[in-house]
């Protein structure tokens, strides 16, 4: 620490160059933090998918008959089955998108324990045909109170009377703790209310969800379910809940490749920029280093000072970029959650990896300049003009 003032002074020898270099590093690590935060959030959603729960859907995304329920329940290895439909709606405007899930209230919560809901709310919902349960964060944001009558404008589920407005009795809230999905605008309604009121696709569901006794038999049980409907017009595709989530994520494209390609390009450019800047700073200070050696600074001390300047510049700027990303991601996720996207965050492990990258970047870009400074001849340096 006794050389910190010297390191700090050397770092700001050319203020404009230092500021522009810092800004470049901040932007690069801000980009790294944002992209890795988004990627990690989606991976977390996928990893929360269970291996002992199967999801049965039509391969083309078409609705499946509710009449298939009894056949699926009879498959060996299946212990419990629930189902749900889906439509997208909005509250007052498209700024408040709602993911509406008409569910089987008798089995849905047993099948999905990640939905945390009080027994009181569950009982009232079960016995209120027009009742709805809403994600706690959404109810708080919109100021809904238990007992309110809430109109939801459906975007893809018209009613038999020709209108698209579904009116619900708000009976309570639920939460999905420790999950990015806790910010999503999910609304649960009774399937019976939805099915008897809709104009089309009556008696159908979006998917079935099966709990199985042995996760190691998931593929076998899934094939047994699909074989039941192999020759029917309503073919099915059954996979684990985790595989289903992965399939949905894959529809966005190869997110890993996208993130890695952008980050690699940014860091390659940053390495070139930082290395060039540090080498230029070294050349400008050759005579200064020679004088320092003359008055007693060792070769090793000079090289350590050069490395320390690079680490301070890179690590300090990287931390600023990462902390900005950590502050921005939850705010962006909260803003986007009203459009149905999950909450976003920057996990500590990504922050740690970013710090490691910053130190590595500093060492790789500064080592050539540090070695030259260590091997610098006093006589040759003082003779240079």
PLM ranges: what are they?
Residues 4, 18-22, 323, 348-356:
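Hydrophobic alpha-helical transmembrane segments
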Residues 15-40, 253-288, 311-320, 361-364:
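Hydrophobic alpha-helical transmembrane segments of multi-pass inner-membrane transport and secretion
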Residues 26-100, 117-128, 140-141, 223, ...:
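Hydrophobic, regular-secondary-structure patches
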Residues 38, 42, 217-269, 280-283, ...:
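Peri-transmembrane interface segments
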Residues 108-134, 139-140, 145-152:
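Diglycine-centered glycine-rich loop/turn motifs
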Residues 139, 144-239:
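Basic-flanked hydrophobic alpha-helices used for secretion and membrane insertion
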Residues 279, 283, 287-333, 353, ...:
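Transmembrane alpha-helical interface segments in multi-pass membrane proteins
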Residues 372-385:
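Short cytosolic juxtamembrane segments of multi-pass membrane proteins
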